[in-house]
Regions:
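Mature catalytic core of soluble alpha/beta enzymes
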Residues: 1-178
Length: 178
């Protein structure tokens, strides 16, 4: 695990905007888009629909959602937030009109070893599963940013996560502790 963590982080990535290239300094480094890809794709789909004149809709990209306009009945889109301790139940329902909602959680993808549950979300600083928060839902104007924030906040402790979120005043969150 220690060797894997050595290959994590932006400091070993060289971006060249002139050549439009990315260079990974260390052999074995990889780039994963899991924390941003769904949100980015969701936003792009919404933008394409808006460009085609579609006045209202909801795009669901693997649970990351982007909305615009209103439902045919004139009401906001109602998005259910799953209760991580009872996944068959909703914790809350949030109305969205021109917003996005994303969730990073450990309640759907995990492994149980020796009776202990481990998240699929890894803390890049330690190389071990993230602990402390079992679910983080972020709401805001952009699914890509919300997706990045929910993934980042899930890896932090609650207080540190709330401090980070203060830098993004257009976004709010629902944090559920383990």
């Amino acid at each position: 695990i220690k060797k894997s963590v050595e290959k994590v982080g932006y400091k070993n990535i060289i971006l060249d905007s002139v050549q439009s290239t990315i260079f990974l300094k260390l052999k074995g480094m990889k780039i994963g888009f899991g924390a941003l890809g769904e949100g980015y794709a969701t936003d792009k789909c919404r933008d394409m629909m808006l460009a085609k004149g579609i006045k209202a809709g909801i795009i669901n990209g693997s649970g990351d959602m982007s909305t615009w306009g209103k439902q045919p009945n004139g009401k906001a889109w109602n998005i259910g937030i799953t209760n991580p301790f009872h996944p068959e139940k909703l914790l809350a329902v949030v109305p969205l009109k021109q917003d996005a909602v994303t969730t990073s959680g450990s309640y759907e993808k995990f492994v149980v070893l020796d009776g202990k549950r481990y998240s699929h979300i890894i803390n890049p600083a330690t190389g071990y599963p993230a602990t402390g928060l079992c679910s983080v839902t972020v709401l805001g104007p952009n699914a890509e940013t919300a997706n990045g924030l929910s993934a980042s906040l899930k890896k932090k402790k609650k207080t540190a996560g709330l401090l980070l979120l203060k830098k993004y005043p257009d976004y709010s969150c629902i944090m559920i502790t383990d």
